[in-house]
Amino acid sequence: MTDCWYIPEAVADRRDENRLSPNVPASYEVLGEVGIFYRHFDPKEVSDDIEGFIQPLLKKLNYQSYDVVNLSPANLGAEKFETLAEQHFMEHIHEDDEVRLILEGQGYFDVRDINDKWIRLLSKPGDCIVVPAGMYHRFTTDQSKDIKTLRIFKEAPRWIALNRGPEAEEKPARKEYLARLHAPAETAVGAANGRTIFSLRYPLKLDVELTAITKRLLEQHSKRPLALAIYLTGSTDPTTGESWCPDCVLAKPHVATRFAELRGKYGEERAIFLQLPVERASYLGNPNFPYRTHPTLQLASVPTLLVLTPAKDAKEKGDVQWHDLLDVKVRTCDADKADVLSLE
């Protein structure tokens, strides 16, 4: 995994790390929220056979062409390099996704979070970054002033930037990006509505947010039973519109069926659905991923479906967290075969 952190609005030297003091780390969940796709490939796998590596990737992403560029004073000349470097660091959007795979050297992508704050994403050999069309961003090399990247395009290679301003704001790509950014999160059972369907993106905030939701639901439905389905699934890959996890794609309709069964048993207002998207870059190869180590979730693989009902003494419990108020009745990686109608 690479590193990402917040930086100030203005920086003295764009090629420094420019961390805040104290450092404020970002996360892949924050990047995912604004549509950034990140994946790391073995740099040797790429550099040993670029053509053999890139052709399957082009097909998967439905892109048509690529080129390789080397940004350095030695390759371009000092004057041309600095001119391009300044252009790349102007805040801008593109009308197509910007797809970059780092081959050699290092650099920084700066992207805006949902509150318009800058996040700096370190980009190293093997890192593949997709910046969605319409998203404000910028790029710089580090102090080495030397980076080699593979660029992927939907059509013929081109790089057209629209600097931040009224003209960029009126572009369809910008308007479509903002519409996606502020749209309700989609889940396996429909759009999140903050009432019976929820999506919580940040693992480190889960307990606080879900405890508040659970207590509110228990108070609202104190005299009638309810059930909470928690679905942990690979987050959506913006390049395909589907989960990065193939098994999660297959599980999605079965999860919807199981939840429909819960609604039939408990009623629409007392069957609650929570989707927990799992970011690939945070999860794979990370034994300390919060959902893995969580005392109740105990995530072993995605997809995983849990169904919980209120603990018998939930009403008597005081200042406790959600997992003290609910009992796990179903835990499965195979939603197709799960029995959610025999809960006691």
From Swiss-Prot:
UniProt catalytic activity: 1,2-dihydroxy-5-(methylsulfanyl)pent-1-en-3-one + O2 = 4-methylsulfanyl-2-oxobutanoate + formate + 2 H(+); 1,2-dihydroxy-5-(methylsulfanyl)pent-1-en-3-one + O2 = 3-(methylsulfanyl)propanoate + CO + formate + 2 H(+)
Keywords: Amino-acid biosynthesis, Cytoplasm, Dioxygenase, Iron, Metal-binding, Methionine biosynthesis, Nickel, Nucleus, Oxidoreductase
One Gene Ontology term of the molecular function aspect: nickel cation binding
GO cellular component: cytoplasm; nucleus
Binding site residues for Fe(2+): H92, H94, E98, H137
Cellular location(s): Cytoplasm; Nucleus
EC nos: 1.13.11.54, 1.13.11.53
Residues at which Ni(2+) binds: H92, H94, E98, H137
Entry-linked Gene3D superfamilies: Glutaredoxin, Jelly Rolls
A GO BP entry: L-methionine salvage from methylthioadenosine
Broad class of where this protein is predominantly found: cytoplasm
Cofactor detail note: Binds either 1 Fe or Ni cation per monomer. Iron-binding promotes an acireductone dioxygenase reaction producing 2-keto-4-methylthiobutyrate, while nickel-binding promotes an acireductone dioxygenase reaction producing 3-(methylsulfanyl)propanoate.
HAMAP family reported for this sequence: Salvage_MtnD_euk (MF_03154)
Function per UniProt: Catalyzes 2 different reactions between oxygen and the acireductone 1,2-dihydroxy-3-keto-5-methylthiopentene (DHK-MTPene) depending upon the metal bound in the active site. Fe-containing acireductone dioxygenase (Fe-ARD) produces formate and 2-keto-4-methylthiobutyrate (KMTB), the alpha-ketoacid precursor of methionine in the methionine recycle pathway. Ni-containing acireductone dioxygenase (Ni-ARD) produces methylthiopropionate, carbon monoxide and formate, and does not lie on the methionine recycle pathway.
Family of this protein: Belongs to the acireductone dioxygenase (ARD) family.
Protein name: Acireductone dioxygenase
Organism: Leishmania infantum
